[in-house]
Design a protein with these regions (language model features):
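A short beta-strand-to-alpha-helix junction
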Residues: 72, 96-103, 120-124, 149-160, ...
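Active-site segment of extracytoplasmic enzymes that catalyze sulfate/phosphate-ester chemistry
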Residues: 35, 48-53, 87-174, 184, ...
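Long, internal low-complexity/basic segments
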Residues: 30-75, 82, 87, 115, ...
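Metal-dependent active-site segment of extracytoplasmic phospho-/sulfohydrolases and closely related
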Residues: 105, 297, 303, 332-370
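A long, amphipathic alpha-helix that forms part
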Residues: 38-41, 51, 275-292, 315-353, ...
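Core domains of carbohydrate- and sulfate-ester-processing enzymes
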Residues: 34-51, 117, 127-130, 190-262, ...
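C-terminal cap/loop subdomain of S1 sulfatases and analogous C-terminal strand-loop tails that border
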Residues: 196-206, 363-387, 402-406, 410, ...
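Active-site His/acidic residue clusters
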Residues: 212, 263-264, 282-329, 364-366, ...
Length: 566
């Protein structure tokens, strides 16, 4: 009897050892380290963890069923991020009518999927893109600021992006359009997990505001080839010259890139900017067709430069009642998105593709009202942590998995897409566990709908400064209490969408201490997981065909960075 038991125990031990070894080889150990989140997540997990665990079992079953029907493959991911579009500008015919223009294709897309009514982003371009790509608040990796010129810094290669994570699970990856995460080699998309990338090194400041056409229309003053009197000019390096900076480049994973469609001595113009936008639309379409032919799932990222524009040089004259230059270009972007959605239908991939369309931050109010956009539901715009700066339209579609024509009123942050997409791509085990991941897995929200979010809070940074905290419908404006915390203002965002009527006594009396502790817990995590600076390096190193004027611009930058006092 003892021999029998001993034999069974020995066999069990061998079986367990074999299973453990297999698990080690596959990197799928049941006791793998969990993700590290911010402190507030654990407050919610303590109270809701058992419910979430039950939900996860059902979600895993549904995702497994999808993969089985899809030939064992995870869904394709198509992410479209539109620049400087505030809340209420897309996806709704009534609000379109108020604005005096139409976005019929995005409106139809919104009806086919879920509207994320409380999508929060960062206040400007670069930080929102970093938050999506890394699942982390940009303050954690030094990428909270937005560079508009040659800068010599960018996203560090040590950051793990959603493209890298999905690549590990067999996804083909492509990026087309705006990037804006640095002008150094390690920061570029083809060095951050994308197999193919076509993108401008910089952003629309260079591409549509700094050039001669913009100076001719006085969108910019004091620059341009023939737009100022230079009799008193001593510092020839003072003025940014769009034509001397690198414009658009193309490349493949791990290799140098090449600047395209810009010859030595050529001036950058609004017409060339328009051609760049048309080219990116064509390349997005080409990549969609190419990726759809593969037997692997794909992650396609398309970040248009339009609707941002400056001069009316390439803008049809008032084809909408609104007539603003951004609005006229948004009409074009809507047309282009419609073409991409139609192509997905024709390729037969719509049902196995998760598509997200959203804005990156609020309106660029500096150019209001000529742009055609002004804040509507919320107050504030780009560069602000008022709701108008960080609340955007966001729509997500996955036929058969996400309920059509639905609305989620839960809080969600752009960083949550990182963690959620990783799970949908069966790649959660590729997310690093040696750093804080701010993004929360929101698969339950997408597949179960309204009230299933796993987040009821968001921390709002402006560059490196924590300026506001949102919890449920209440917002603490930390900026208003810089001199004295007692003076910090509370707002009820349901009753006061424009943050004009503080309820500091009514909410602060019971919630003030709770919010202070939230901030203390958040800051306390930084002792173990401190914020890091961005990567630095030689601007444009890794571009094989730098023009002579670009090489001179780099030398000017390097000299100014090493002058006394720097």
């Amino acid at each position: 009897m003892k021999d029998n038991v001993a034999h069974r125990i020995t066999g069990a031990v061998k079986l367990f050892t074999g299973l453990l070894a297999a698990s080690l080889l596959n990197g799928q150990i049941a006791t793998a380290k969990p993700l590290v989140h911010d402190a507030e997540y654990y407050v919610l997990e303590k109270q809701n963890g058992e419910t979430w665990a039950l939900e996860d079992k059902d979600l895993d079953k549904r995702l497994a069923e999808f993969r089985k029907k899809n030939g064992g493959r995870s869904p394709n991911i198509f992410y479209i991020l539109i620049d400087d579009i505030g809340f209420g500008d897309l996806g709704d015919e009534t609000l379109n009518a108020i604005r005096g223009y139409k976005t019929p294709n995005i409106n139809e897309f919104a009806r086919e999927g879920m509207r994320l009514a409380r999508m929060y982003t960062e206040p400007s371009c670069t930080p929102t893109r970093v938050a999506f790509m890394t699942g982390r608040h940009p303050v954690r990796n030094g990428m909270g600021n937005t560079a508009v010129d040659i800068s010599g810094f960018g996203l560090a290669e040590g950051e793990v992006t959603i493209a890298e994570i999905l690549s590990e699970k067999g996804y083909n990856t492509s990026h087309v359009g705006k990037w804006h995460m640095g002008d150094i080699r390690e920061a570029w998309p083809n060095m951050q997990g994308f197999d193919y990338a076509a993108f401008p090194i910089h952003q629309q400041g260079q591409l549509t505001i700094y050039h001669d056409d913009a100076a001719d229309e006085e969108i910019s003053i004091g620059i341009g080839k023939n737009n100022y009197d230079d009799r008193y000019t001593m510092d020839e390096w003072l003025r940014t010259d769009a034509s001397s900076m690198v414009t658009g480049v193309e490349g493949v994973r791990g290799e140098n890139v090449r600047e395209v469609y810009m010859d030595a001595g050529e001036r950058w113009t609004e017409a060339k900017y328009h051609e760049m936008n048309e080219r990116y639309q064509s390349q997005a379409m080409e990549q969609l067709r190419k990726l759809a032919k593969s037997n692997k799932p794909f992650f396609l990222q398309y970040w248009p430069l339009y609707p941002l524009t400056g001069p009316r040089t390439t803008t049809d004259q008032y084809t909408t009642p609104n007539g603003g230059v951004y609005v006229e270009k948004m009409k074009l972007v809507d047309k282009w998105i419609g073409e991409l959605m139609t192509e997905m239908d024709e390729l037969g991939i719509a049902d196995n593709t998760l598509v997200v369309i959203m804005g990156d931050n609020g309106h660029f109010t500096k150019y209001s009202p000529g742009s055609g956009y002004t804040p509507m539901v919320f107050r504030g715009g780009k560069g602000s942590t008022l709701e108008g700066g960080v609340r955007v339209d966001a729509f997500v579609r996955w036929p058969g998995m996400i309920e059509a024509d639905s609305v989620a009123g839960d809080i969600i942050h752009v960083s949550d897409l990182f963690t959620t997409i990783a799970r949908l791509g069966d790649a959660t085990d590729e997310i690093p566990t040696d750093r804080i991941i701010d993004g929360i897995d929101q698969t339950s929200l997408l597949l179960n709908g309204d009230t299933y979010s796993r987040r009821d809070y968001v921390f709002l940074y402006n560059i490196n400064n924590l300026e506001a905290v949102v919890k449920e419908q209440y917002k603490l404006d930390l900026a208003s209490g810089k001199e004295n915390a007692i003076l910090a203002k509370f707002y009820d965002l349901f009753r006061d969408t424009r943050e004009e009527w503080p309820v500091s006594t009514e909410v602060g009396a019971w919630g003030g201490a709770k919010f202070v502790r939230m901030v203390q817990r958040h800051m306390g995590r930084k002792a173990k997981y401190p914020d890091a600076p961005p990567a630095t390096g030689m601007p444009y190193a890794g571009i094989d065909n730098l023009r002579p004027e670009t090489q001179a611009a780099v030398q000017e930058f390097l000299y100014m960075m090493k002058t006394p006092g720097m």
